[in-house]
From Swiss-Prot:
Keyword Nucleus: no
Phylogenetic placement of the source organism: Bacteria, Pseudomonadati, Pseudomonadota, Gammaproteobacteria, Enterobacterales
PROSITE patterns in the cross-refs: FLAVODOXIN_LIKE
Name of the protein: NAD(P)H dehydrogenase (quinone)
Ranges where the Flavodoxin-like domain occurs: 4-189
Length: 198
């Protein structure tokens, strides 16, 4: 069985919703075992609550377990064009995996969210840098998801990976089109992983 991990950080629930859609898409692939986990929260609980953070139910991952998966699909909100501090802190703990080459050749893909759309592509491509140092095979989604051609409404989604636009106050939830792109990303990456493990 090919093991696929959807690993995310979500403060307000947008990336959590996208992660579920990515996992739903990946689960369509025969031969793929899909696991959804989150990275640990680094904010003090009182500050997280005061900021309106949403309680997450997914189990917390450890950096060492990344070596157990054939493909990892990372989800992170944008922080000034980069991954969130929580995801950065988690990945900064993977030095031992890097030293041993434990992630070399594993598939990696990234999805993201932004407040207003600024930085969504940059967040994905800047995350790729860390994954490339691990020797992971980076999987963009291209334009195969037909929703990427729809310009009739505001929406996220890029050839680099699925995205959602949360709005400046976070009130906008992922649209059906954005979730469809996320499902496509999960199915596409899981399908490639199964073929490579074939």
């Amino acid at each position: 069985m090919t093991k696929v991990l959807v690993l995310y950080y979500s403060m307000y629930g947008h990336i959590e919703t996208m992660a579920r859609a990515v996992a739903e898409g990946a689960s369509k692939v025969d031969g793929a075992e899909v696991v959804v986990k989150r990275v640990p929260e680094t904010m003090p609980p009182q500050l997280f609550e005061k900021a309106g953070g949403k309680t997450q139910t997914a189990p917390v991952a450890t950096p060492q377990e990344l070596a157990d998966y054939d493909a990892i699909i990372f989800g992170t909100p944008t922080r000034f064009g980069n991954m969130s501090g929580q995801m950065r802190t988690f990945l900064d703990q993977t030095g031992g995996l890097w030293a041993s080459g434990a992630l070399y050749g594993k598939l990696a893909s990234v999805f993201s969210s932004t407040g207003t759309g600024g930085g969504q592509e940059q967040t994905i491509t800047s995350t790729w840098t860390t994954l490339a140092h691990h020797g992971m095979v980076i999987v963009p989604i291209g334009y195969a998801a037909q929703e990427l051609f729809d310009v009739s409404q505001v929406r996220g989604g890029t050839p680099y990976g699925a995205t959602t636009i949360a709005g400046g106050d976070g009130s906008r939830q992922p649209s059906q089109e954005e979730l469809s792109i996320a499902r496509y990303q999960g199915e596409y990456v899981a399908g490639l992983a199964v073929k490579l493990n074939g």
